[in-house]
Amino acid sequence: MYRYKITIEYLGTNLAGWQRQAGVISVQQILEEAIYKFSGEQVILFGSGRTDAGVHAIGQVAHFDLSKHLEPHKIITAINYFARPYAVGVWNCELASNNFHARFSATSRHYIYRIINRPYPSVIDLNRAWWISSPLDVLTMQKAAAYLLGKHDFTSFRASSCQSKSPIKTLTELNIIKEDEEIKLYLSAPSFLHHMVRNIVGSLVLVGKNVWQAEQIKDVLEAKDRKAAGPTAPASGLYFVKTEY
């Protein structure tokens, strides 16, 4: 068997997320069907992260096995031919060791969350960012973010449906940068809980609006209670940008 590692980008707006589900269109389904159409082989695609409906990706990584050797550039061309109508594309493909696993071999995952912060919405960024009309205090948001860096129990920021065995995660990066009318939050960790990024963003926005003081983020973290945190930020602003191995 030959194992192939692919890097994928997609607009998640009209998709049900990464994972194959009955009755809806998912990224996994689109790619598995595309691979079958050119290879004639039924494959199971393993992704480095399971993005939710509406979440986008720039650097999602996945792997699959084929019984025959194919040139990587031909795989890219073939997958993109069948997947492009769904705003899903592959931009890299390479042979990988049979010991490689897109999910379990990963050492770090990186996300960006985009906020358009101006009085009027952006037509160009419709469904590609969270529009917030009231001014956000980025400096105070960054101060609050510092409380979340490092290894913590992130129960307050996990979805009630989260299936992770442990709420303990290590946040290695949480930077907030304002560029003109756009605010970008950069988050990195070896792995994340379900909705963890979006719940952190929703809470930091309350700080940015001066609804909360920066220090309240520490209290939320220590509460270990989802009800203590802010709302879940919209999926449209979230981008899965990179996986490291």
From Swiss-Prot:
Catalytic activity: uridine(38/39/40) in tRNA = pseudouridine(38/39/40) in tRNA
EC code(s) of this entry: 5.4.99.12
Family matches, as Pfam families: PseudoU_synth_1
Keywords: Isomerase, tRNA processing
Active site per database record: 52
GO MF annotation list: RNA binding; tRNA pseudouridine(38-40) synthase activity
Binding locations of substrate: 111
Source species, domain of life: Bacteria
CDD domains with a match to the protein in the record: PseudoU_synth_EcTruA
UniProt xrefs under InterPro entries: PsdUridine_synth_cat_dom_sf, PsdUridine_synth_TruA, PsdUridine_synth_TruA_a/b_dom, PsdUridine_synth_TruA_C, TruA/RsuA/RluB/E/F_N
GO biological process: tRNA pseudouridine synthesis
HAMAP family the UniProt entry points to: TruA
Described function: Formation of pseudouridine at positions 38, 39 and 40 in the anticodon stem and loop of transfer RNAs.
Quaternary assembly: Homodimer.
Family membership: Belongs to the tRNA pseudouridine synthase TruA family.
Record's protein name: tRNA pseudouridine synthase A
Organism: Rickettsia felis (strain ATCC VR-1525 / URRWXCal2)
